[in-house]
Structures are given as structure tokens and as C-alpha cells.
Regions:
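Short charge-dense sequence patches
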Residues: 1, 35-41, 98-100
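A broad structural signal for short, well-ordered beta-strand segments within beta-sheet-rich domains
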Residues: 5-12, 54-61, 100
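Terminal targeting/leader modules
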Residues: 1-4, 24-30, 55, 94, ...
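N-terminal, intrinsically disordered, polar/charged segments of Gram-positive cell-envelope systems
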Residues: 1-25
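Extracytosolic low-complexity repeat regions of secreted or lipid-anchored proteins
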Residues: 64, 68-108, 113
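Aromatic-enriched hydrophobic runs in primary sequence
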Residues: 1, 44-47, 90
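Mature extracytoplasmic domains of secretory-pathway proteins
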Residues: 24-82
Length: 113
């Protein structure tokens, strides 16, 4: 679903019931982390890039951070040339992994992370 946005920073908002959690290999109690190279962080990135039309190796990751609680995160990413800009929200689903919940197509990177 594509919706318009009232936010001047956001061109449109994408959501989809078809988006699935990125399958986790983590076991035991989930600990959210934002340390590059940690399995939880890498799974966050896999989930984020599964719903945008750019490849991780052709992108700039501006921020990945907590989105209000330990079971949610938000990232701002762009293509290397900065023509494609996105803010992606994900949520942790127990025993499944990180699931994308919303993509905002950004008009600008300024003030978005």
C-alpha cells in the first residue's frame, strides 16, 4: 500500500501485509544491539534492505537506532548517489526475526535521522 504523507520530509509511505520477518538464527532471549558485525544488527539490515529497491553494498547507512523500545528499530538509508532515500521501521517478532513494518520514501536526508 502506498500512502501520501503530510510530513514535508516524506514523499510517500509504503506498507504491506506481505512483508515477512527476516528469518533469525538467534536463539535464547533476544537482545537487540546496534553493533556492526553482531548477528542481531546484521539481521536488522537484511530485513531493512528486503523492502527497498537498493542493494546494501550500493547504499549509505545513515543511521540504525532504537525506535522506542527493544523490539523496534528504525533506519535511514540511501543509494550511494543519494537519489533514493528511505526511512525503514522494523519490529522484532519472537522466534521469527526482524519484520519490516513501514518504509518512508524521503524527500531529503536533512533532519530525518
Amino acid at each position: 500500500v502506498i500512502n501520501a504523507s503530510d510530513d514535508p520530509l516524506v514523499a510517500e509511505i509504503w506498507t504491506s501485509d506481505a512483508w515477512q520477518a527476516y528469518p533469525t538464527v538467534q536463539t535464547g532471549e533476544h537482545q537487540s544491539t546496534f553493533t556492526e558485525g553482531h548477528i542481531d544488527y546484521e539481521e536488522k539490515l537484511q530485513s531493512i534492505f528486503s523492502v527497498v529497491p537498493i542493494e546494501q553494498q550500493e547504499s549509505i547507512i545513515w543511521s540504525v537506532k532504537n525506535n522506542g523500545n527493544a523490539k523496534s528499530a528504525i533506519a535511514v538509508i540511501s543509494s550511494n548517489d543519494k537519489t533514493q532515500k528511505y526511512r525503514v521501521a522494523i519490529e522484532w517478532i519472537e522466534q521469527q526475526g526482524w519484520k519490516p513494518v513501514q518504509v518512508e520514501v524521503l524527500n531529503t536526508l536533512e533532519g530525518t535521522y
